């Protein structure tokens, strides 16, 4: 069994905000399996799906972002799961909108939901996937709690579907396989964008 946790804030006022990308990925996974996260358990909305032959619990903690660890640790204890059977999905301001990054472990990197999970779980040795939302010049709080713009949606909506596919690869093939497949895609995307940006700069300098 695996536990896939998407981080976000509960309530309609936070729906479709940048900070709730984790919830959006969970909802897409549930929709594909024609189920919904209506069951409430250990301060989370959950449901169970099957990926391949693997049973998977999808969870959206309802504790608010900064207390996500309360729900995650309770669910892991209930289902008797180890940290390597946990996969956390969250937003990341340090990545451009729509870019994914999968890691085997690591620090919270300023993401408070991840920070709380690490503190309460007592380890940072669990895989996670970050979905980029970009960093504003100022007003970080307003940015993460703001609604996704139409321009951003053109990048983020496809990334949500890509994140769904990445989850499936993680469940079936493991973290390294997911990293190899999806982090490499992001690298190629960045490499493609960099020459274009350099060309634009040359034109501006003329």
Swiss-Prot record:
Per the UniProt record, which EC number(s) apply here?
Answer: 3.1.1.29
What is the protein's name according to its record?
Peptidyl-tRNA hydrolase
A GO biological process this protein is involved in? rescue of stalled ribosome
- Reaction equation(s) it catalyzes: an N-acyl-L-alpha-aminoacyl-tRNA + H2O = an N-acyl-L-amino acid + a tRNA + H(+)
Transmembrane regions listed in the UniProt entry:
none
Q: Which residues form a coiled coil?
A: none
Q: Any idea which positions bind tRNA?
A: 14, 64, 66
Q: How does it assemble?
A: Monomer.
Q: Where is this site: Stabilizes the basic form of H active site to accept a proton?
A: 91
Q: Which organism is it from?
A: Desulforamulus reducens (strain ATCC BAA-1160 / DSM 100696 / MI-1) (Desulfotomaculum reducens)
């Amino acid at each position: 069994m695996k536990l896939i946790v998407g981080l976000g804030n509960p309530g309609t006022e936070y729906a479709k905000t940048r900070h709730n990308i984790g919830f959006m990925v969970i909802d897409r996974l549930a929709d594909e399996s024609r189920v919904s996260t209506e069951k409430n358990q250990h301060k989370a909305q959950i449901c169970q799906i099957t990926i391949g032959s693997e049973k998977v619990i999808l969870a959206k903690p309802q504790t608010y972002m900064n207390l996500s660890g309360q729900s995650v640790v309770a669910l892991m204890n209930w289902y008797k799961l180890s940290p390597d059977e946990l996969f956390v999905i969250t937003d990341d301001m340090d990545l451009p909108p729509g870019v994914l990054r999968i890691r085997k472990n690591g620090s919270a990197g300023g993401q408070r939901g991840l920070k709380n999970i690490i503190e309460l779980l007592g380890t940072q040795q669990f895989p996670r996937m970050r979905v980029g939302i970009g960093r504003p010049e100022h007003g970080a709080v307003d940015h993460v709690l703001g609604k996704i713009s139409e321009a951003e949606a053109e990048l983020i909506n496809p990334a949500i579907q890509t994140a769904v596919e990445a989850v499936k690869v993680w469940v079936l093939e493991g973290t390294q396989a997911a990293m190899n497949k999806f982090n490499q895609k992001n690298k190629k995307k960045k490499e493609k964008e960099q020459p274009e940006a350099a060309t634009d700069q040359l034109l501006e300098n003329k």
